[in-house]
Amino acid sequence: MNKSQLYPDSPLTDQDFNQLDQTVIEAARRQLVGRRFIELYGPLGRGMQSVFNDIFMESHEAKMDFQGSFDTEVESSRRVNYTIPMLYKDFVLYWRDLEQSKALDIPIDFSVAANAARDVAFLEDQMIFHGSKEFDIPGLMNVKGRLTHLIGNWYESGNAFQDIVEARNKLLEMNHNGPYALVLSPELYSLLHRVHKDTNVLEIEHVRELITAGVFQSPVLKGKSGVIVNTGRNNLDLAISEDFETAYLGEEGMNHPFRVYETVVLRIKRPAAICTLIDPEE
């Protein structure tokens, strides 16, 4: 069903809705960081309100024998159920702007929708990295069972690369052999853009040779913090019921409120596939 049929009282045509949806999706893509290295599970459909998550520990190993006897150990150490929260931001299209667009035969300015999508995308990354206490959802930076690494002084050339190597080695010791993604706070990300000592190459170029799933920065990470993740849906994914939709909320005072929303939750299956970088002074 197209949007004009779904919302028959809306002032927008099918073409307008298509332009609105495209504007929202493009704005969200420019903002989102977590989705650049986390695989998606879904969309599951607008009726899905919860999803289970199997959490795996690192103690279970493969077996070798002649008969292949049944292993009584359960691979999944724990199963939890997450309520899938709605992330949303409302915006208003004013009736005078819509009438002007019709009278002059010009496109509708959907910049207000783009800004709403940007805010929802920021909230998604906030949930991915820091979780949600209200919904009991852990994030990459605070999930129990993750690895941690205390970083040195990145203002000295070479220290950043050395810390990333050591954090990666901790993941390797837990049999997480990549590919890895690295997300840094803006402060730490900027410090990678200096010449690596005894070379003519920026440190970030050497880091990218190790971190093959991408090196990113995110404004949701503050101070001197970061995280290295062994990517793959066996370690974590993003369960989605509805992905960046727009809805018409009904006329209000001659104007037309809309909503940008998504229903999404992070599922961390192997916490030991995550290593957070921590400033010892914080």
Swiss-Prot record:
Q: Which InterPro entries match?
A: ENCAP (IPR007544), Encapsulin_nc (IPR051429)
Q: Which GO terms describe its cellular component?
A: encapsulin nanocompartment
Q: Does the keyword Glycoprotein apply?
A: no
Q: Which gene encodes it?
A: enc
Please state the biotechnological applications recorded for this protein.
Answer: The encapsulin and cargo pair can be overexpressed in E.coli and in human HEK293T cells. In HEK293T in the presence of 0.5 M ferrous ammonium sulfate nanocompartments can be detected and used as cell markers. Can also be targeted to cell membranes by addition of a farnesylation signal to its C-terminus. Coexpression of this nanocompartment with a smaller nanocompartment from M.xanthus (AC Q1D6H4) allows of expression of different sized iron-rich particles. The encapsulin shell proteins do not seem to mix.
User: Could you tell me the keywords of this UniProt record?
Assistant: Encapsulin nanocompartment, Ion transport, Iron, Iron storage, Iron transport, Transport
Which family does the record claim for this protein? Answer: Belongs to the encapsulin family. Family 1 subfamily.
Temperature dependence comment? The empty encapsulin nanocompartment is stable until 86.6 degrees Celsius, when loaded with cargo protein is stable until 88.9 degrees Celsius and when grown in high-iron conditions is stable until 91.8 degrees Celsius.
Q: Which Pfam families does the record associate with it?
A: Linocin_M18
Domains: what does the record tell us?
Answer: Formed of E- and discontuous A- and P-loops. A-loops form the main pores while A- and E-loops are the most flexible parts. E- and P-loops of neighboring monomers arrange head-to-tail and form a chainmail topology.
Site 3-fold pore central residue — annotated at: 9, 71, 251-252
Q: What is this protein called?
A: Type 1 encapsulin shell protein
- The domain of life for this entry's organism is Bacteria
Which biological process terms from the Gene Ontology are attached to this UniProt entry? Answer: intracellular iron ion homeostasis; iron ion transport
Q: Where in the cell is it found?
A: Encapsulin nanocompartment
User: Subunit details for this protein?
Assistant: Initially thought to form a 180 subunit shell. Forms hollow shells composed of 240 subunits, making a shell about 42-43 nm in diameter. The monomer is capable of assuming 4 different conformations which allows packaging into the icosahedron. The shell has 12 pentameric and 30 hexameric capsomers which form the vertices and faces of the icosahedral nanocompartment.
Kindly list the residues the record flags as site (5-fold pore central residue).
Answer: 200
The UniProt function text for this chain reads: Shell component of a type 1 encapsulin nanocompartment. Assembles into proteinaceous icosahedral shells 42-43 nm in diameter with an iron- and phosphorus-rich core (1Fe:1.1P) which can store over 23,000-35,000 iron atoms (with a calculated maximum of 83,000 Fe). There are 2 types of negatively charged open pores in the cryo-electron structure; a 3-fold pore where 3 hexamers meet with a minimal size of 7.2 Angstroms and a 5-fold pore where pentamers meet with a minimal size of 2.3 Angstroms. The 2-fold pore seen in other encapsulin nanocompartments is closed.
